Amino acid sequence: MAKKKQNTENYLAQNRKARFNYAIAETFEAGISLTGTEIKSVRAGQITIGDGFVTIHNGNALLTNVHISSYVQGNQFNVDPLRTRQLLLHKREIRVLEKATQEQGVTIVPLKVYLKHGFAKVLVGIGRGKKKYDKREDIKKRDQERELSRRFKN
């Protein structure tokens, strides 16, 4: 009998600052519409999502300000590294995202980029911007957890 492959979460890019700067309420998994040279660059890990965000325009979810480096062997087929890319979501998911962004202070941010069954996927989250004191509370909690883990380790 064939062995099942283990589900190892292998992230190509992760937006660590997103959970620090935003309170993430809900997440969605979306496909990304990429060209051939772009997917090769993504598989090589040449993607930066730190400054990225998602906009809804004419019923389409668009990933903006995400940098995918040019593929080295791609020459004439390379495209603009910062071009806007379409996210592949169901219509009801797009409606939920569009309704959420109608509120003041709510944005859609990419959290992680990973491969799933050979396809590039992005995990996007609906986030509300945190205040400075909320960020300080998060830092205090994190420091307390580290201190507890050190005590239990020794």
UniProtKB/Swiss-Prot annotation:
<dbReference type="InterPro" id="IPR023620">
    <property type="entry name" value="SmpB"/>
</dbReference>
<dbReference type="InterPro" id="IPR000037">
    <property type="entry name" value="SsrA-bd_prot"/>
</dbReference>
<dbReference type="Pfam" id="PF01668">
    <property type="entry name" value="SmpB"/>
</dbReference>
<dbReference type="GO" id="GO:0005829">
    <property type="term" value="C:cytosol"/>
</dbReference>
<feature type="region of interest" description="Disordered">
    <location>
        <begin position="134"/>
        <end position="154"/>
    </location>
</feature>
<comment type="similarity">
    <text>Belongs to the SmpB family.</text>
</comment>
<dbReference type="InterPro" id="IPR020081">
    <property type="entry name" value="SsrA-bd_prot_CS"/>
</dbReference>
<comment type="function">
    <text>Required for rescue of stalled ribosomes mediated by trans-translation. Binds to transfer-messenger RNA (tmRNA), required for stable association of tmRNA with ribosomes. tmRNA and SmpB together mimic tRNA shape, replacing the anticodon stem-loop with SmpB. tmRNA is encoded by the ssrA gene; the 2 termini fold to resemble tRNA(Ala) and it encodes a 'tag peptide', a short internal open reading frame. During trans-translation Ala-aminoacylated tmRNA acts like a tRNA, entering the A-site of stalled ribosomes, displacing the stalled mRNA.</text>
</comment>
<dbReference type="GO" id="GO:0003723">
    <property type="term" value="F:RNA binding"/>
</dbReference>
<dbReference type="GO" id="GO:0070929">
    <property type="term" value="P:trans-translation"/>
</dbReference>
<keyword id="KW-0694">RNA-binding</keyword>
<protein>
    <recommendedName>
        <fullName>SsrA-binding protein</fullName>
    </recommendedName>
</protein>
<keyword id="KW-0963">Cytoplasm</keyword>
